Regions:
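Loop-to-transmembrane helix boundary motifs in multi-pass membrane proteins
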Residues: 1-4, 10, 135-136, 246-252, ...
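Membrane-interface "cap" regions at the ends of multi-pass membrane proteins
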Residues: 1-18, 45-52, 56-69, 73-80, ...
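Select transmembrane alpha-helical segments in multipass membrane proteins
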Residues: 1-7, 32-35, 74-87, 136-141, ...
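Inter-helical loop and helix-membrane interface segments of multi-pass membrane transporters/permeases
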Residues: 22-27, 57-81, 94-154, 183-207, ...
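Helix-loop-helix connectors at the membrane interface of multi-pass transporters/channels
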Residues: 64, 97-128, 229-233, 238, ...
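C-terminal membrane-solvent junction of multi-pass transporters and transport-like membrane proteins
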Residues: 71, 78-81, 325-336, 368-426
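Membrane-embedded translocation segments of transport machinery
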Residues: 1, 158, 162-306, 324, ...
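Transmembrane helix-boundary motif of multi-pass solute transporters/channels
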Residues: 2-39, 224-227, 238-241, 245-246, ...
Length: 443
């Protein structure tokens, strides 16, 4: 159960609690949710099973997995792509994760709601552009992640997941109950659950596919790394379903928590990424016991962030540990220091380095663009092609059925899907994210 919860924690994180609600809000609500769920089932689960197979069969880190399965070839570069993507994502995720600790502290100290007529937009911008405070909180969050990683898989990651995942659900449920009892909460629930198919454009469909890919941590090596710790009797098909269902449930609960409150206070649902740090403090400020609800929410967000940073950190740590034959403590320290150093530039890009751009983007945004729009789709697509074309199908079936003890009636369809359908679907997302699809179609 611990390894399943750890894998759930790998997939469930900021992508579900922070990114999903504002993506849903920006893409029309229920119609986006419906398409998102379909993609989670028909694309997410098969690709996840594939990454589970690679990890458990090879019993190695992301690079080592491809080296063992295709020695002497260039396929190992899929692993290098995943590790680099995880490292880069961790560097800027740690900045956002640090913000969650700042808001927990502001709430506990009474500062967030202890001042009359506070401008939450200016307050957030002042904090994010500060040279020292965001870096301090980023360092604290990296230190917390480092502590869990150094404790190892069983004592650290699995134990933390056993505690955090049930707590995450409990806090989400408490916040959902509070949100749906607000005036005009029905409008938020209708937005979330009543589809308006007139809003279902090609852009919304592709955004839903991209969010499904992002939510399940596909293509960044996390699932390959975690599945390398699976037991030989782990049912990888069932685990993929469990992870996907729990991930989707968390995302939907996050929507129930946020949108009734947004509609209750007349806030636009497409407020964007700042919904969490600018819009929601305004909402909490108008509630009785505002400090309590705010504190509960930001603790929830910090926990979601920690599940993300742990999984990303473990990808890089496992590689350094195994490939360079280091102790876990030394490997984790190297990764933590590297992440902290790179994260400084992401943090400063909101302030003193705002004028420094890479390809017209601030440093933080450039890393997000590089990883989310190029490295992850590319890695996922190549992984599907690798399994569909290079892996012995007898070996694949034996592994996925635990040497014939489990049934896999749709194995033939699964192989066809991985060889043709999944790479094409992910390729479409890849081309869309780069803007190439719009250029080709002229739309």
């Amino acid at each position: 159960m611990g390894v399943v919860l750890a894998t759930v924690g790998c997939a469930v994180g900021l992508g579900s609690v922070w990114r999903f609600p504002y993506m849903l809000g920006a893409n029309g609500g229920a119609a986006f949710l419906l398409v998102y769920i379909l993609f989670m089932i028909f694309l997410g689960i098969p690709v996840m099973v594939t990454e589970f197979f690679i990890g458990r069969y090879s019993r190695s880190n992301t690079v080592g997995s491809f080296k063992k399965m295709a020695p002497g070839t260039k396929w190992c570069w899929i692993g290098y792509n995943g590790i680099l993507a995880a490292f880069l994502i961790l560097s800027y995720y740690s900045v956002v994760s640090g913000w969650t600790l700042e808001y927990v502290w502001q709430t506990l100290s009474g500062r967030l709601y202890g001042q009359p007529d506070i401008d939450y937009t200016a307050d957030f911008q002042d904090f994010a552009s500060n040279v020292f405070r965001p870096i301090f909180w980023m360092g604290a969050f990296i230190g917390l992640t480092h502590f869990v990683i150094v404790s190892g898989v069983e004592k650290g990651i699995e134990r933390a997941s056993k505690i955090m995942m049930p707590l995450l659900f409990l806090i989400l449920l408490i916040m959902c109950v509070r949100s749906v009892t607000l005036p005009n909460a029905e409008a938020g629930l209708l937005f979330l659950f009543k589809p308006d198919f007139s809003k279902l454009t090609s852009s919304v469909v592709l955004s839903a596919l991209g969010q499904a890919f992002f939510s399940l941590s596909l293509g960044m090596g996390c699932l390959i790394t975690y599945s390398s710790y699976f037991g030989k009797d782990t049912n990888m098909q069932a685990t993929a379903w469990q992870v996907t269902i729990i991930n989707t449930l968390v995302a939907v609960l996050a929507g129930i928590m946020i949108f009734p409150a947004v509609f209750s206070f007349g806030i636009t649902p497409s407020a964007g990424a700042e919904l969490v740090f600018i819009t929601l403090p305004n909402v909490f400020g108008q509630l009785p016991l505002s400090g309590l609800w705010s504190c509960i929410f930001y603790i929830l967000l910090a926990m979601a962030a920690l599940t993300s940073t742990i999984s990303l950190h473990e990808v890089a740590t496992a590689y350094v540990l195994e490939e360079f034959h280091m102790t876990r403590k030394k490997a984790a320290l190297i990764v933590s220091l590297g992440v902290f150093f790179l994260g400084i530039f992401s943090s400063l890009s909101f302030g003193v380095m705002k004028g420094f751009t890479v390809g017209g983007l601030a440093f933080f945004d450039a890393l997000d663009y590089l990883t989310a729009k190029i490295m992850l789709p590319l890695g996922g697509m190549l992984t599907c092609i690798f399994v569909g074309t290079r892996v012995d199908k007898k070996v694949l079936k034996a592994e996925l059925t635990n040497e014939g003890t489990l049934k896999f009636r749709l194995f033939g369809a699964y192989v066809f899907f991985m060889k043709y359908v999944a790479p094409i679907a992910i390729g479409i997302v890849f081309l869309n994210e780069l803007g190439i699809l719009k250029w080709i179609t002229g739309k």
